């Protein structure tokens, strides 16, 4: 195994803590006969346990060795895989260089572990090659990643030779992409102590769809039309969803990402204090073969906050043109995003800012930088009752409409008033207690 792994070229830049790298070293010890049996068994078990940990995190099943190798190939970002993400496996010299890598991975897929298991008196590789995982709820792992890894793994198992193996992997790159952006729908920003950041996949995003949001048909269509144009490569606008709390603004964004994920749409959630990274975030994703929504939830600015300047600079663009594959979608309870105080209306009270009127105008004009603004208002009582009854029927509730509306009316009076969120909470309560 070690000799094969050491010949990898495009996929050979393995971190020293990578499972494949560690196993290669351990198998080299076994092959040359320089090992302590107890220590070697312990070290092999450590790496097998790591494979089990990955399998648990991502919901792998059946042949975990194949699942792990498949996951490794899917996550390997290199010049070849990123090019395939954009244009597929085009003819060129690089194909010849990569062909040997895929020949090696085909051998690793077909690797016979019996000699080492027999010599060391272990069966861990046999066990993980025919593994039956405990059934888990989807929210305990990334169901989307699990499905893709297991499906691709089955195709690679069936590959007759390295050419078919090559075709299957490169076909996946072209269809879905490579690395974390290829496998995941949504990300958040994780800040580092050194001032840098990284993208962290959101593994348990709600699997909500637009049809799950009752009502708001005009708003949903407006959002869908803009997003559909965006994923089709047409001109589209930044979007601001504003209005009352609990009316479905954030739900609409999540549903849009779920709906257009297969069309290459990805979402990056960013908080206000992270706006300083906006330029670097854009630089990191602008050349990838995806459409990115930079998502800002519950966006608003107080009088003393200046983070809006970072956002405004990105939206307006400076010397560098904003990439066509990036849009900003934001939700807010404030129509103008920024709280306007009485002092904002009175220049005389702001002697420290000789151009205070310009400052106020700069703040309030931020909303105009969003080409599409969509209003989400609280539903009327009739609309509220309609939301309640539809949600109840979808949940299998057997109470009559009259009973539901009567109890919903009592509920909303003590739970924040009429809204889609209140309706959902009420139905959850009813289903839990009936």
Label every PLM stretch briefly.
Residues 1-157:
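Intrinsically disordered, low-complexity N-terminal extensions of AAA+/P-loop NTPases
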Residues 133-199:
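Interdomain "pre-motor" coupling segment immediately N-terminal to P-loop NTPase/helicase cores
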Residues 200-228:
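N-terminal pre-Walker A segment at the start of P-loop NTPase domains
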Residues 234-253:
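Walker A/P-loop nucleotide-binding motif
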Residues 259-292, 299-304:
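AAA+/P-loop NTPase substrate/partner-engagement loops
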Residues 302-352:
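Conserved catalytic/switch belt of AAA+ P-loop NTPases
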Residues 349-364, 371-385:
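Conserved AAA+ ATPase "SRH/arginine-finger" region at the nucleotide-binding site
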Residues 373, 377-434:
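C-terminal alpha-helical "lid" subdomain
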């Amino acid at each position: 195994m070690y000799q094969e792994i050491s010949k990898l070229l495009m996929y050979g830049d393995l971190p020293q803590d990578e499972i494949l790298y560690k196993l290669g070293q351990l198998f080299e010890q076994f092959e040359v006969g320089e090992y302590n049996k107890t220590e070697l068994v312990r070290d092999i078990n450590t790496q097998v346990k790591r494979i089990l940990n990955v399998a648990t995190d991502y919901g792998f099943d059946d042949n975990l060795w194949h699942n792990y190798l498949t996951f490794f190939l899917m996550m390997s970002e290199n010049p070849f895989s990123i090019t395939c993400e954009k244009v597929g496996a085009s003819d060129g010299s690089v194909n010849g260089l990569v062909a040997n890598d895929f020949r090696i991975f085909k051998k690793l897929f077909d690797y016979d572990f019996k000699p080492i298991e027999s010599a060391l008196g272990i069966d861990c590789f046999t066990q993980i090659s025919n593994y039956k995982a405990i059934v888990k709820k989807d929210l305990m792992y990334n169901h989307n990643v699990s499905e893709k890894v297991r499906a691709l793994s089955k195709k690679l198992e069936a590959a007759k030779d390295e050419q078919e193996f090559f075709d299957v992997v490169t076909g996946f790159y072209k269809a879905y992409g490579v690395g974390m952006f290829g496998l995941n729908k949504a990300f958040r920003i994780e800040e580092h102590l050194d001032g840098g950041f990284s993208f962290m996949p959101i593994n348990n995003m709600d699997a909500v769809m637009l049809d799950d949001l009752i009502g708001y048909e005009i708003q949903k269509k407006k959002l869908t039309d803009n997003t559909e144009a965006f994923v089709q490569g047409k001109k589209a606008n930044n979007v601001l969803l504003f209005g009352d709390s609990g009316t479905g603004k954030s739900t609409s964004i999540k549903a849009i990402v779920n709906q257009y994920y297969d069309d290459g749409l990805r979402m990056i959630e960013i908080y206000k204090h992270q706006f300083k990274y906006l330029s670097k975030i854009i630089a990191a994703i602008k050349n990838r073969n995806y459409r990115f929504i930079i998502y800002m939830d519950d966006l608003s600015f107080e009088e003393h906050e200046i983070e809006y300047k970072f956002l405004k600079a990105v939206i307006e663009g400076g010397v560098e043109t904003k990439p066509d594959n990036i849009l900003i979608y934001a939700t807010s309870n404030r129509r103008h995003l920024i709280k306007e105080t009485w002092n904002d209306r009175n220049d005389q009270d702001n002697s420290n800012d000789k151009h205070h009127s310009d400052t106020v105008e700069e703040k309030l004009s931020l909303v105009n930088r969003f080409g599409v603004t969509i209003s989400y208002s609280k539903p009327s009582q009739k609309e509220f009752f309609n939301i309640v009854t539809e949600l109840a029927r979808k949940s299998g509730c057997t109470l009559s409409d009259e009973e539901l509306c009567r109890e919903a009316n009592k509920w909303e009076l003590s739970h924040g008033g009429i809204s889609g969120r209140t309706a959902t909470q009420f139905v959850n309560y009813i289903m839990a207690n009936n």
